[in-house]
Amino acid sequence: MTVVRDDPIRPDPGFAELYASLPDATDLWPWLELARAAAPPVLYLGIGAGRLAVPLEAAGIQLVGVDSHPGMLERLHQRLPNTELIQSRIEDLDLGRRFSMVMVPSNLLETVERLRHAAAHLAPAGLLAAELTNPYWLRAGASAGVRVQAFDGNGARFEVDYNLPDGRTVTQRAEVTLVWPDEVENWLATGAGLRLRRMFGRPDAELASSPSFYVVAGRG
């Protein structure tokens, strides 16, 4: 079994290889709808190897991409050579620019430090859109291919299996800080001075059973 880990401080080459091996996303909800409503470019934090970014660019969305993993950005640059890409952890990001939309898919914005740095890049009327791991889903035991190894309400450690097109199975080990849906409004306000505009689960699941949930927030 091949095991990889997302470590922004000590990037795992296998992690970039895994995501480069995954097929591009075909369902762009809700990111395409949100990005189309924003003035370009859209700041994409955690842009990765491009499985979502490439289809978004093909749909006409202009992106500025940030990722901490050099291997991810190297692969993405080969696919999107004209897209501005920046290597940085979210916690260290200071572009000196503001954006109409900051999007953070893939459950990366769970800490207050990351939230503050993302919010600092919002234009006055800009919106932050983020995907967060759903604690209710993890507490219920998650789903097939996901093994919850530790859960204490504030954080979780789990493994996710990916079955690749070439027949291999690669396991990603993950540790997350958890934000509960009923705490999001206060988390946004106290952490970054943001106001919750929308919160919703995936279209095929209620908020309490959705593997992740989505938050849209802005100032004022």
Where are these regions (language model features)?
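A short acidic, Gly/Pro-enriched loop at the edge of an enzyme's catalytic core
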Residues: 92-101
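C-terminal lobe and adjacent flexible extensions of AdoMet/dcAdoMet transferase-like proteins
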Residues: 181-220
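Residues lining the SAM
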Residues: 105-106
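A short, conserved alpha-helix within the catalytic core of class I
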Residues: 110-118
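SAM-dependent methyltransferase
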Residues: 118, 125, 129-187
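Conserved class I S-adenosyl-L-methionine
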Residues: 1-48
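Class I SAM-dependent methyltransferase SAM/SAH-binding core
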Residues: 49-92
